[in-house]
Curated annotation (Swiss-Prot):
Keyword field contains Metal-binding: yes
Family the entry assigns: Belongs to the frataxin family.
Name the UniProt record assigns to this protein: Iron-sulfur cluster assembly protein CyaY
UniProt entry tagged with the keyword Metal-binding: yes
Keywords linked to the UniProt accession: Iron, Metal-binding
Species of provenance: Dechloromonas aromatica (strain RCB)
Residues of the signal peptide: none
Gene name linked to the record: cyaY
Length: 105
């Protein structure tokens, strides 16, 4: 995958996450900053940070539960450790951090 393809796919993923956060009812604040960094802040002031890492061609997620790297497999973004899909993993991480069920679609 070349840089332009990675950037397009990463931007689509970040936009999808942003739209899913808009649609959920959870008590959280979020902002997608230029350059591909998405900060999600929870009621307890903890954060999840989602950003693209162009050199590795991965999307990185930093949460209270740890750091996660997602790589494009040709169809979806998958965790490099357990092969979990990005939106499913973010839903799990956000639910753990918020203390309530959060489903991002």
């Amino acid at each position: 995958m070349d840089d332009s393809e990675f950037n397009a796919l990463a931007e689509q993923a970040l936009a999808r996450i942003d739209a899913a956060l808009e649609a959920c009812d959870a008590d959280l604040d979020f902002e997608l900053a230029p350059g591909g960094v998405l900060e999600i802040e929870f009621a307890d002031r903890s954060k999840i940070i989602v950003n693209r890492h162009s050199i590795a061609k991965e999307i990185w997620v930093a949460a209270r539960a740890g750091g996660f790297h997602f790589r494009w497999d040709g169809a979806s973004w998958r965790d490099t450790r357990d092969n979990a899909e990005l939106m499913e993993k973010l839903s799990t991480l956000a639910s753990q951090q918020a203390g309530e069920a959060i489903v991002l679609r």
